[in-house]
Each structure stands twice: as structure tokens, then as C-alpha cells.
Amino acid sequence: MVTKSRKTSDRMLKYLLLKNIKKRKKIMEEQNTPIWWLNDESEQMLNRGYLLKGETVEGAIDRITTAAAKRLYKPELIPAFKEMITKGWISFSSPVWANMGTQRGLPISCFNVHVPDYIEGITHKLGEVIMQTKIGGGTSGYFGELRNRGTAVTDNGKSSGAVSFMKLFDTAMDVVSQGGVRRGAFAAYLDIDHGDIEEFLNIKEIGSPIQNLFMGVCVPDYWMQDMIDGDMDKRKIWAKVLESRQKKGLPYIFFTDNVNRNKPQVYKDKGAVINASNLCSEIMLPSTADESFICCLSSMNLELYDEWKDTNAVKLAIYFLDAVLSEFIDKTEGNYYLQGARNFALRHRALGLGVLGYHSYLQKNMIPFESMEAKMFNAKAFKQIQEQSIIASKELANIYGEPEVLKGYGLRNTTTMAIAPTTSSSAILGQTSPGIEPFASNYYKAGLAKGNFMRKNKYLAKLLEEKGLDNEDVWREIMLNHGSVQHMKELSQTEK
């Protein structure tokens, strides 16, 4: 006679061996552990670099949530963390999927270094960036302190300029991968009033020795106002910036004074200057020679906002991210090239809880992207996330203490929010819309680092099905119209 426990064991073994995603989902539903977002595309994404060898998606979720609860000394939170991810309320960043709760890599997503104007400091920061990339991070650096090309240096020679040193970082990105998951990526930031700005704007041009770097210009108020007022030299440079953005999508534009006017109060009180952003330009934090800013990221799924809005999901997300930060701090102890990042993590504990699925929520509820209703939802959702994340940070400070920078502020984290691009994360989470961006097309091929996938707008498909129009001829017509439905007379203006 086969016992109930033996039957359960055999059934789970059979489940783990099944290759067909539909059969797997059926078994999960029978066991009351559905992961609705786990389809062919999301599973392929995860299996191509985010899971350990032989690990299932469910095993990865167990690994990550158990590690987070352990860092918080709160094992009772494991079921709540699991519910958050299996229901699709939260999306982990790529390094969290790949490295949280493992002996490899680190679970932090982004870093920035402040490159000083002396050779020992430059080479040390290069070492930092290589190590940050190796363990799974996207990186950036501020080069504004480096002297212009041709400036005298102490040995009676002349400086080769900021851009020449960027070549070292460019080469590093060509040979170092992010924890084996993807090629390294680095953004170089330079002030628009730096003497090497025109050389900098030629990065990634045909014939340029620098082809792998991303780039950003830091623009102060005085410079922008002079340009607007008619300074011809500045207008020529601004024209080159705009031309470069049109041709290459770069540089990012970082408005230095605007950022520093709106930085957290603690940084204003302590006179901390924010010079640059991160690789994806969503993080604004201070870096120095001794501290390299980091920010650990994950995102709330706005597509399912109505499911989690009346729960403690945001609080749990902040608790989770603080646990990720604790794992980073523990794992980096004793690592020479990560001490700058570890110093920042210990002293600031900056978090970046963002969102994805914004456009999917609007489409799900038939709300036009530029409507007043969309603006009202935008304000409501982000107000809630901001308020609840601050409450959570205060709770964490009461439980675990304030970090050095926040002594006397009653907070655990200098920042709690950031809007990351989430291209891979949204693909994993049921192909919801990335970040706060709109879908560019209703029918297209998504070319991602982990593969190419054909995408149909699921809410459009549902609408077409209701109208009896969900067929290949209609979709072919949509494809020929570059993914647009504006030509379809069968749809109302609101539906379009």
C-alpha cells in the first residue's frame, strides 16, 4: 500500500521532471501554488542565466525568500515573501534572482564610482568597477575631477585627459561579464563645462576607440541659462548633445543643480554633493573617494495594484530590500575592491523600490495613457508607495537601528524609491509593461539579452476576442501597421 507521503513525493518528482509548461502549471494549480506569470518566455529567461544549475523557478523563489527572512531574523516572513513573488506583486532585479542566497555573486544591481584626479585613484576605481561588474552589477563613474587633455601634471608632462582614461573602463566592459549573466555595462559621466566635452561627445562614433560605454553629461543651471540666453559656444555644444542623442540615444542628460535641490534632507544637512547617476540614470546618490554609491532594486507590479493596494505589500518589499542589502554587506566583508561600495551600504543603506506594469494597468482598465484619470492614478500609486516605504524604513530603524549617516533621523534608509527600466524583470513577470514606459507596439519581436520573443498585447487580444476579431488576418494587418490599431474602424477612439 502506498502511503500519502509517498504519493506526494512521487508526484513532486514527476512534477520536477516535466518539460511541458502547461502540465507544470496544472500541477501547481492542483497543489494550490500557482505562479500565473510563469510561461514559456519567462521560464526561458530565468533558465538562461538567473537560476542555479538544476534549479527550478520554485526552488529559486524558496532560496531567495529564505535568505531574506534569515537576514532579518524573521523566518515567519517567508510565506509572505513567497506570496508576493508567486502572485506577481513584486519583481526581483536580475542580481537578486541570480545571486541572493548563493555563494556566487552579489544581489546588488547598480554602482557608481567617483574617479579622482591621480593615477593611483584612477586605477583603484577601475579595479572597483571590474569587481562590481564581475559580481553582477551595472556600473557608472563620474570623471569630472580629471584634468583636461593637455593640462600640466606634476612630472612636467601633460594630462592625456578624461576621455583617455575612459578607454580603460571601455576595455574592462568588453572582457568582464556580470556574474556570467550578461556583458558588463558602464556609463561614464562628464560635466558639460569640462574641457574635454567635445571629445567625450564623440564616444561610440565610427572610428572612436571607445565603443562599449554608455555616457551622460552633467549640466548645471548656469550653463543651461547661458546657452538659452545666446552664448554661441554653449549652443554649439548643446547642438552636438542633441545630435548625439538623435543618432545614438546618448548621452543621458543629468541636471546637476536640479538633482541637488531635490536630494534627501539628510544629504542637504550634511552637505553631500551628488555629481552623477548610475548606468540607467534612475539613481541619484553621492559618491566620494571613500564611498561608491550602491542601490538595491526591485519593483512593485502596478498591473496588479488593485490586488495589493490594501495589503502590507510595500512594507514587505522594503523589508525584503533591506535584507538584500544586509546580504551584500556580509558578502563583501574583506573584499578590497568592494570596500567603497560596502562603506556606502553600511553608512547609507539606500534602497530603490520602483514599479513596472504601469501601462499594463492602464490598458487593463481602459484608461488612456495621457488622460486625467491616468495622471490621478499615477499620483495615487506613487504617493502610497512613498508613504508606506517611509513607514517601513522607520520600523526597520526601530528594530535594527539607524545607519551612521541617518543617526537622529529615525530612518533605516537614505532613499527608498527608484524607477528602474525593468526590461528583463518585466519579461520575466508575465511580460508586463516595463517600468513606467508605454508599450511601443501591440505586436512585435522583443529582442532581449536572453533571447528573442514574439509579443502580442494581451489586453488587445482579449478585446479582439470579445469582438470576434482575434484571428491571424487581423494580427497580420496590425503587424503591417507597425503594431498600431489606429487603422481599425472596429475599435472606438477610447479603445485605440
Where are these regions (language model features)?
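Extended catalytic cores of very large enzyme megasubunits
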Residues: T3-K7, L13-K496
